[in-house]
Regions:
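N-terminal carbohydrate-binding accessory modules
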Residues: 1-49, 70
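Substrate-binding/catalytic cleft of secreted carbohydrate-active enzymes
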Residues: 46-49, 56-173
């Protein structure tokens, strides 16, 4: 399907209509199969979410199985597609490893992979730069690259707070 995502007057709009996100985080973990999630379990997850009036899901903290996005497209769940970027334990101050040059390529490539492989899914309404790491030049470069490829979706990043690298203020906890 087609859709237009925009932010006007601090309101998220999809196809010109205000959207109240009632979302959940989802890890690819199955109570029976561990890290192997069957298509049947994915469908069960979607049906439970729909029954609970959940309209959005964040793929935390990595891209999910490609079939998950196809199901979200089919069943009408909005998706925040999160890049495989997690830096717990690296700190959040100016000395954080995530701000250093040795992480620049990794942060950029993980965001590039996320956008390049998932771009055509209409369920994806937000790109996420990653989870809980410190803001800085590496994330600025990742955001700039995403915007060079796709200006049609807002960019989210939980630790950015109200900084320049997130179009949405969306504290997770």
């Amino acid at each position: 399907g087609f859709r237009k995502v925009e932010i006007k007057n601090k309101q998220l709009l999809v196809n010109g209509q205000p959207v109240l996100i009632k979302g959940a985080d989802r890890h690819e973990m199955d109570p029976d199969g561990g890290y192997v999630v069957t298509l049947e379990r994915m469908l069960q997850d979607i049906k439970i979410m729909k029954r609970l009036n959940i309209n959005a899901v964040r793929t935390c903290h990595y891209p999910d199985d490609p079939r998950w996005y196809e199901l979200c497209d089919q069943y009408g769940l909005y998706v925040t597609a999160e890049a495989n970027q997690e830096s717990h334990g690296f700190g959040y101050d100016n000395t954080s490893e995530a701000k250093k040059e040795n992480f620049a390529r990794q942060i950029l490539e993980r965001n590039q992979h996320n956008v390049e492989t998932l771009f055509n899914h209409p369920s994806i309404i937000v790109w996420s730069l990653g989870n809980e790491t410190v803001d800085g030049p590496n994330f600025t470069a990742a955001k700039e690259w995403i915007l060079s490829q796709d200006k049609s979706r807002p960019i989210h990043w939980e630790r950015a707070g109200t900084g320049d690298n997130s179009d949405l203020f969306c504290p997770m906890y």
